[in-house]
Amino acid sequence: VAKPRIGGGFGAKQTSVCEVYPAFVTWKTKKPSKIIYTRFESQTASTPRHEMEMHVRLGATKDGIVRGIDLYTLSNTGAYGEHGPTTVGLSGHKSIPLYGKAEAFRFVSDVVYTNHMSAGAYRGYGATQGLFAVESAVNELADKLGIDPFVIRQRNIVHEGDVMPAYYGQVNTSCALDRCLQAVHDNIGWDEKYPVRDMGNGKVRAVGMGMAMQGSGITSVDVGSASLKINDDGFYTLSIGAADMGTGCDTILAQIAAEVLDCPLDNVTVLGADTDSSPYDSGSYASSTTYVTGKAVEQCAEQLKQKICQVGAGLLGLDARAVVFAGDAVTSEDGTQRATLAQIAAASQCGSNTALEAVVTHSSEISPPPFMVGAAEVEVDLETGEAQVIRYEAAVDCGTPVNPNLARVQAEGGILQGIGMALTENVTYDDRGMPQENSLMQYKIPARNDIGHIHVVFESSYEGTGPFGAKSIGEVVINTPLPAVADAIYHATHKRFYELPITREQIALAGQ
């Protein structure tokens, strides 16, 4: 399989629905074939997110220290069991560990079949639903205790070095959640805007907050591989099995190689996934590519650099321990002798026993979580029920961002998706189990003009097991808008909403 340039994965490409049909056509006709969905087919034959019903109980001291968390999740997997048992697990696995002071926790789940669309993987993968429930419960706890939601989180969050019993007992090796919390508080002007302000003409503005964590690949399961070689002109070719689905991972992986090899990014050519020639990669899913495949690339580049030094030392008549890799050349320690990369590459192709190529496969025994805090400022028209997010502040700890620009647009896109889940995107079924929202006229996805200012900052930690300290970012960014927007609407209307999306009709009734 030679992967073409595709975009917009978000989990949909993990599940085979109609792909078998063009395969049969090709098999029978011996000719290429493709299947192109209409919008109706895309809306009715693809895999939506799992519908979940959650029950949360919290035990806390009077000063807001959360001592116990009890979460039950009932998940609707639809007509088939695609991803059913795994997504439901993440609803607890990626929410409970945020609260590091809890002395007791329980997570119980059930998955049921229904006569609905078969649910599948979607960005956030169950954590999104669980975080909406747990974070909303914490916001409600703060309200009942008369404590600022920001303050109650300050008192309870997990910190770097803490053991996380609800996260496989893993040590929190890198964490800037405390700094993310403070940054969002300061950037949105929380103290001046919390909880609500009357803007006149029946409109109010309120703020709400939420936190999130995710994973960086699947522990001891995901595999990333890289092959790297130097060409006769001194440039590099990097072959990877990971699929760039619009995330920019080809660029990021090339950056990692270029950093190790101390060369311009343009000197690294990336060859994408081709199952006949690319090294094995288990797939671009579960926020794993930068953390898992990126580490393989880093190790691969280090191995190649050592081989280049060996050949360069031979050309200079020196011991390999007496030379220095200088990016475009190998030099003696005093700099008086020099062999260029082109000379070294040419030498390796004639009478050499050292192949200037390296292949590395990597898998991680841990999955260090990225963290995020988000705060929404929502303007609500109490008469019409219209709610608009006019400002969203976010702070993300994804370790050390390899490419801050790509990380930022990942975050902005995830926030926009989360706001859509909170306010407009809904799926309902008729008596036959057919979805009613079968076009974009009925299924409202927010456009950029529907949302106000989105501002993302990064609070860097350093994850020693990742490439140059990096963790994942792909999924965590969708998780905070749901509880943040819901809490802001509560402050505006004084009514809690426990189902999503929160529609204009519901808000208008609450405002009466």
Give the label of every model feature segment.
Residues 3-19, 45, 79-84, 201-211, ...:
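FAD-binding core of FAD-dependent oxidoreductases
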